[in-house]
């Protein structure tokens, strides 16, 4: 039975195709349209489907929508409609207002008919947003039982769900409703500090430069820890649904930062305090989960689960022995969760498919790649061992675009759509930030490390699979040897690389290790202010306009591109 899951209501639109419980394909719409997050979250566009991602999934399986038995959407329109009953600071016709929520609901309801027009003849399902997040975390995990925490901005009316999983059953045991939302708190602080609502990674990177002390008490006025793992937020100050930072300005005694203004020590201190209270809240939730559910396994999803600093705290806290985090923890992952919920809860499917990697996106043949090389006027050669060639270039301080195999599903580049560099040189970080990626200097870079050497280079008390997906931060043992991948706080957000899961990438890092004595490389996403590259054409276009030294694409090494 083919089951398709789709996420389309807000942002990070995506599709995932499952066959008899096995994940066949999953991709985000942004990778095809080249528009970050696919679309903004608005009340007037929830019916816009990820048609390119759907088309890719079907093509990968060699089927059409007529062959799909079930489609699940990761939203419950009726429950979401009740948002206008929540007292809030809203703009008429927008989120939270009766007119806005009615528009959102009515347009959502057109989705089944749209799918019918595309050829779908099976059964359609509306599904709980946070239950889809939870399903995406538990069903691909290696556990037979687990506590599951899903935390983000908002789903229908909730921001956080705690669930208990056993076998193929996944049961919600509690929710925390809006406006108690860690995800929205991060969005609000990000915009207050002059970034966009999608810039949580920038805020997290900046936090390491600050001291939480000066502003921690200010956040304590905003946030209260409550019994049973709950928490509350003062939306009278935050005003999540209004373009209004006056409450935060009064609280912090600091005017909102304009995007062009300098980032100051006060801004860094505010982000450090935000990170500290996020750690407190998530530890509070996880402690309750451990004590109430009686399991030593924890699964996580939702945008908050992309916070590698908090994940490092949770991993070291001791409440759980094993941690699994869905690599597509953001809303795109709910497409996967929707498909798996239908397979297990509706169809009663017993088979589970452990998700040990995230390589479910498009891949391209050597013929596809060489056609693109010729079309772009590339200066290239075919090499016998691309991994060895790339390792030698990295050891010579070159920056290499690395395009191999199937694209990753999720926001992290995990060795198939990556920019690689030598971690030993501090100048590498500055060059990548300023000349290649065109981003802020305070943002760190991550290392990909051979799994068999990870504990020699990082303080990993309890290994967890989340490190395979670059989702946990650990303290570096030898920061002076790898300064380009160690943040100012002495930690690194590592990706552990296994030979059996990505042999070509493992061989590259092994080659670099033999040359330099360092079993890791700098790995950042292959993009420049746009979505991660998907196709050979995307890779060549980014290579041409960026200051990347070489492009290793399939078995081909590209030195230059002369035309588009």
What is each stretch, according to the model?
Residues 45-60, 71-75, 508, 516-518:
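Short HxH-centered metal-ligating active-site micro-motif
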Residues 56-112, 135-136:
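Short beta-strand-loop/turn "lid" adjacent to the catalytic site in phosphate-handling enzymes
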Residues 32-63, 282:
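N-terminal phosphate-binding loop and adjacent alpha-helix
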Residues 58-61, 138, 278-281, 285-293:
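Structural motif corresponding to the C-terminal cap of alpha-helices
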Residues 259-285:
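Adenine-nucleotide phosphate-binding core of ATP-dependent small-molecule kinases
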Residues 2, 7-36, 42-45, 87, ...:
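Flexible beta->alpha loop and helix N-cap segments adjacent to enzyme active/binding sites
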């Amino acid at each position: 039975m083919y089951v398709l899951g789709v996420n389309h209501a807000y942002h990070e639109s995506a599709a995932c195709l499952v066959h008899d419980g096995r994940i066949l394909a999953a991709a985000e719409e942004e990778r095809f349209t080249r528009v970050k997050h696919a679309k903004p979250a608005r009340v007037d566009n929830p019916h816009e489907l990820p048609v390119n991602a759907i088309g890719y999934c079907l093509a990968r399986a060699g089927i059409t929508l007529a062959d799909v038995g079930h489609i699940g959407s990761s939203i419950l329109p009726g429950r979401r409609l009740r948002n206008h009953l929540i007292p809030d600071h809203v703009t008429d016709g927008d989120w939270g207002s009766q007119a806005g929520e009615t528009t959102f609901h009515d347009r959502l309801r057109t989705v089944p008919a749209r799918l019918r027009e595309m050829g779908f003849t099976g059964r359609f399902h509306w599904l709980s947003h946070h239950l889809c997040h939870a399903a995406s975390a538990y069903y691909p995990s290696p556990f037979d039982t687990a506590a599951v925490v899903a935390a983000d901005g908002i789903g229908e009316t909730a921001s956080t769900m705690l669930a208990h999983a056993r076998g193929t059953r996944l049961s919600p045991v509690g929710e925390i409703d809006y406006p108690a939302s860690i995800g929205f708190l991060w969005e609000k602080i990000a915009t207050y500090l002059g970034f966009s609502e999608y810039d949580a990674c920038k805020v997290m990177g900046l936090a390491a430069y600050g001291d939480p002390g000066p502003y921690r008490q200010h956040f304590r006025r905003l946030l209260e820890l409550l019994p049973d793992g709950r928490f509350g937020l003062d939306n009278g100050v935050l005003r999540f649904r209004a373009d209004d930072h006056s409450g935060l300005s009064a609280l912090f005694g600091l005017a909102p930062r304009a995007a062009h203004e300098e980032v100051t020590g006060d801004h860094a201190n505010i982000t450090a305090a935000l990170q500290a209270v996020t750690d407190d809240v998530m530890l509070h939730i996880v402690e309750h989960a451990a004590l109430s559910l009686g399991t030593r396994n924890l699964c996580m999803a939702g945008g908050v689960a992309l916070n590698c600093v908090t994940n490092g705290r949770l991993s070291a806290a001791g409440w759980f022995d094993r941690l699994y985090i869905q690599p597509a923890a953001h809303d795109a992952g709910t497409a996967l969760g929707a498909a798996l919920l239908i397979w297990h809860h509706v169809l009663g499917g017993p088979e589970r498919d452990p998700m040990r990697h995230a390589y479910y996106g498009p891949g391209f043949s050597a013929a596809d790649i060489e056609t693109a090389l010729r079309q772009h006027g590339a200066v290239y050669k075919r090499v016998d061992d691309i991994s060895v060639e790339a390792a030698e270039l990295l050891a010579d301080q070159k920056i290499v675009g690395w395009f191999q195999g199937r694209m990753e599903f999720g926001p992290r580049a995990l060795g198939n759509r990556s920019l690689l560099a030598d971690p030993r040189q501090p100048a590498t970080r500055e060059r990548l930030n300023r000349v290649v990626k065109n981003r802020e200097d305070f943002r760190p870079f991550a290392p990909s490390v051979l799994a068999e050497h990870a504990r020699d280079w990082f303080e990993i008390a309890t290994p967890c699979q989340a490190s395979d997906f670059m989702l946990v931060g650990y303290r570096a043992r030898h920061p002076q040897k790898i300064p380009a991948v160690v943040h100012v706080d002495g930690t690194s957000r590592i990706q552990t690389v296994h030979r059996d899961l990505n042999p070509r990438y493992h061989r590259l890092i092994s080659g670099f290790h033999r040359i330099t004595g360092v079993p890791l490389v700098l790995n950042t996403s292959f993009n420049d202010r746009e979505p991660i590259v998907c196709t050979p054409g995307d890779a060549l276009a980014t290579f041409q306009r960026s200051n990347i030294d070489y492009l290793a694409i399939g078995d081909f090494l590209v030195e230059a591109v002369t035309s588009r």
